Regions:
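Acidic, low-complexity, intrinsically disordered interaction modules
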Residues: 40-44, 48, 53-56, 61-125
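Short aromatic-glycine-(Arg/Gly/Cys) micro-motifs in beta-strand/loop hairpins
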Residues: 3-24
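Short active-site loop/helix that positions an aromatic residue
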Residues: 30-44
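Ampiphathic alpha-helical segments that act as solvent-exposed interaction surfaces
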Residues: 1, 112-141
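Residues at or immediately preceding the N-termini of alpha-helices
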Residues: 30-32, 63, 127
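A short, exposed loop/beta-hairpin motif centered on an aromatic-Gly-Thr core
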Residues: 22-30, 57-59
Length: 141
């Protein structure tokens, strides 16, 4: 996705640059426009793969689909990096690996005074946890 740069004049003395992405959104910072263009690229990739999405869960059949979803989420969660002085994608799920054809849930918990928590679970894991929990009651009955 290309980012188009334009110069505009607000008054005779004030000029500024604005950056327009392919979906028509306008940004005043190039790095923010670049991150949004990356989001559009990864969103298109996820859509082209045919990944099903419902309520924050994604059904990934291949590792390539899983990586596209993780990258898309990274571009959704961009932040300003003071050291680099630009907006950058935040990939909190890069340490998680593809574990086969499954539904993947990506969670984020905001902690006021502590670092935020990010984790991923699969539907198979949740089913196994529920089966184990149910089994303890069936055994004691």
């Amino acid at each position: 996705m290309a980012v188009k740069e334009e110069s505009r004049v607000r008054c005779e003395e004030i000029t500024y640059k604005q950056y327009t992405t392919s979906d028509g959104k306008v940004f005043l910072r190039k790095s923010e426009a670049d991150v949004h263009a990356g989001l559009l690229q990864w969103s298109d990739a996820v859509r082209n793969f045919g990944v099903k999405n419902t309520g924050g869960a994604y059904h990934c059949r291949t590792e390539e689909e899983f990586n596209a979803v993780v990258n898309m989420i990274a571009y959704e969660n961009y932040a300003y990096d003071c050291n680099e002085r630009k907006f950058v994608p935040q990939n909190y799920y890069e340490n998680y690996k593809f574990s086969g054809d499954d539904w993947y849930f990506f969670f984020h918990k905001s902690n006021m005074d502590y670092p935020d928590e990010y984790w991923m679970e699969t539907l198979s894991q949740k089913k196994q946890e529920f089966a184990d929990w149910l089994k303890q009651f069936e055994e004691s009955a």
